[in-house]
A protein has these predicted regions:
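N-terminal secretory signal peptides that target proteins for export/translocation
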Residues: 1-3
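Bacterial N-terminal signal peptides
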Residues: 7-17
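Asp-box/BNR beta-propeller blade signature and adjacent active/binding-site loops
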Residues: 23-389
């Protein structure tokens, strides 16, 4: 998280494509779809939910395509990046042609929206942001701050709530600062907790959110921690550390509750050869067992419960051949080391792709959303419909 193409209308064409390249019998690729593409914008980092009436809502981060302005490249940090949304009423095949604005932060630079739909229909949308400071101001900021690109200062996390299906959103709500975090905002205040990744609502109604914290700037080191809400996301309490290490950093974590009640954090790693990692709690989130590598590369991960309680684990693959991959795990996620890999996409153009987020469509189909680019193309929001066997 901290390391961090075609007319102007939505391209929502359903492209029939071959079945998965893997021999895995449990999942078969049906088709790829374009969810949102526009040559004026770099569109990325989607999340998706299905509303009670079957409507799909995808939130994503959109920023101006700097290449169209004759600049040398696009960044993942931009003063004009906003949270946008599109909707589908036909199972993800076609999407609303004009995206709706979910939120534009007053200080700019909104990132990676993470949607969670609660059982009562309430929507949460997490994000984090960057504030852009002119060169004469940066040296005068109270330290320590995190500067990504020149002048872009990390501002921490926030989230939005909606009780009407995303038609209207609350003003930003700010999670608590956690003690492990050393960074300050550009205004000299403690950083609010932040993360890019899926939250989950547990069987008892509590919401689990694994957030990141910068423990050290030199050398850079990031750990993860669990926050819990018992009031539908109105407030949060710190629970415990999730994963930390003297050399390896962890961030961009999605959290999942198994039928048995284990809480599993699926972790992106840094300085660990891009290996997917996980940590497990067997006491309801009071503590976590030591983190472990999962034996394969890819990031970040998203876990989705299937109708039969198996788990679809999806992840971006930024190694050749570039694309999107998945595994179907057992209900308790104990067979990650042996579950066959499913290749959803292997036609990526550059490594600026991935970040999948999935949703169940019906008893036998799933939509996997992600951002993608093909050779010579611009980043756009896409998806793959997968048949589950």
């Amino acid at each position: 998280m901290l390391s961090l193409r075609p007319p102007f209308v939505l391209l929502a064409l359903a492209l029939l494509s071959p079945t998965s390249h893997s021999a895995e019998p449990s999942g078969r690729k049906v088709r790829d779809v374009v969810i949102y593409a526009n040559p004026l914008f770099h569109s990325a980092f989607p999340s998706v939910v299905q509303r009670p009436d079957g409507e799909l809502l995808v939130a994503f981060r959109r920023a101006p395509n700097r290449l169209a302005l004759s600049e040398g490249h696009n960044n993942h940090v931009d003063p004009n990046s906003y949270i946008m949304g599109v909707r589908s009423r036909d199972g993800g095949v076609t999407w609303t042609p004009t995206p709706e604005l979910i939120y534009a932060h007053p200080f700019g630079g909104s990132q990676d929206p993470g949607l969670l739909q609660l059982r009562d229909g309430t929507l949460l949308c997490t994000s984090y942001g960057w504030t852009f400071v002119r060169p004469d101001g940066v040296p005068k900021l109270k330290a320590p701050v995190l500067e990504n690109y020149p002048g872009s200062i990390f501002n921490g996390g926030y989230y939005l709530r909606s009780t009407d299906g995303g038609k209207q959103w609350s003003a930003p709500l700010y999670p608590p600062h956690i003690d492990a975090e050393i960074l300050l905002t550009p205004y000299g205040k403690p950083i609010p907790a932040y993360n890019r990744g899926a939250l989950t609502e547990g069987k008892d109604g509590r919401i689990f959110w694994v957030v990141a914290a910068c423990d050290s700037i030199q050398p850079s080191k990031i750990s993860t921690h669990l926050l819990i809400s018992s009031d539908h996301g109105l407030s949060w309490q710190y629970s415990c550390p999730v994963a930390g290490d003297a050399k390896v950093s962890f961030n961009e974590t999605s959290v999942y509750e198994t039928p048995r009640g284990d809480i599993i954090a699926f972790l992106r790693s840094e300085k660990y050869e891009d290996q997917a990692c996980m940590a497990r709690s067997i006491d309801g989130g009071k503590s976590f067992q030591p983190w472990q590598g999962m034996g394969f590369q890819g990031h970040p991960l998203h876990a989705l419960r299937l109708p039969d309680n198996r788990v679809l684990l999806t992840y971006g693959y930024r190694h050749k051949p570039l694309g999107i991959r998945a595994r179907i795990l057992n209900a308790e996620c104990t067979d990650f080391a042996t579950a066959p890999e499913i290749v959803l996409r292997d036609d990526g153009g550059t490594s600026d792709l991935g970040y999948p987020w999935s949703v169940v469509l019906d008893a036998h189909h799933v939509l996997v959303t992600y951002y993608f680019n093909v050779p010579g193309g611009l980043q756009h929001v896409a998806g793959t419909i997968l048949e589950i066997r």
